[in-house]
């Protein structure tokens, strides 16, 4: 079964109803109907929370976070091993640390697909399956 890895940029496109929001909704629906799995790293989840709080305030942040992920989705903790893997990706491939956590999750198997609107991942698309949402 496919496992989608959601990047914060994809989630924010969804909230903004931006380019690719419909694709993110398809991914969320596939997870809710158990046709696919969905994961997001705790660091990416935190990025989403911070951006929502800054834009909408605390009460809307919590409401929006609760509305995003189906209960079947998994927020993956930043373990010591994951932190070391992400650090290596950050240094070796010159990507942001939080992005390295998402990339590390996407590298778990050939059935994992990172969904993102961040074209900075083009520099590492040789390491994992990456689905890029349309440019704005």
Residue ranges and their predicted role:
Residues 6, 39-40, 77, 97, ...:
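Short beta-strand scaffold positions
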Residues 59, 64-79, 83-84, 92, ...:
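Short acidic, glycine/proline-enriched helix-loop-strand junctions
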Residues 11-12, 45, 121-122:
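A generic structural signal for short hydrophobic patches within well-formed alpha-helices
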Residues 1-3, 103-136:
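Acidic, PIN/NYN-like endoribonuclease modules and their adjacent C-terminal/linker elements
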Residues 23, 47-48, 85, 123-124:
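Phosphate- and divalent-cation-binding pockets in alpha/beta enzyme and binding domains
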Residues 73-113:
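Active-site neighborhoods of divalent-metal-dependent phosphate/nucleic-acid chemistry enzymes
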Residues 1-40, 53-66, 136:
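Short, well-structured N-terminal submotif of metal-dependent ribonuclease cores
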């Amino acid at each position: 079964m496919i496992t989608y890895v959601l990047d914060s940029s994809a989630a924010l496109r969804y909230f903004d109803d931006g380019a690719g929001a419909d694709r993110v909704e398809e991914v969320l629906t596939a997870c809710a109907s158990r046709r696919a799995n969905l994961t997001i790293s705790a660091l990416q989840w935190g990025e989403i929370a911070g951006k929502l709080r800054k834009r909408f305030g605390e009460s809307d942040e919590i409401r929006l976070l609760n509305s995003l992920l189906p209960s079947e989705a998994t927020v993956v903790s930043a373990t010591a091993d994951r932190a070391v893997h992400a650090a290596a990706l950050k240094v070796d491939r010159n990507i942001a640390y939080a992005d390295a956590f998402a990339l590390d999750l996407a590298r778990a198997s050939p059935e994992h697909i990172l969904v993102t609107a961040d074209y900075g991942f083009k520099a590492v698309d040789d390491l994992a399956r990456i689905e890029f949402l349309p440019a704005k």
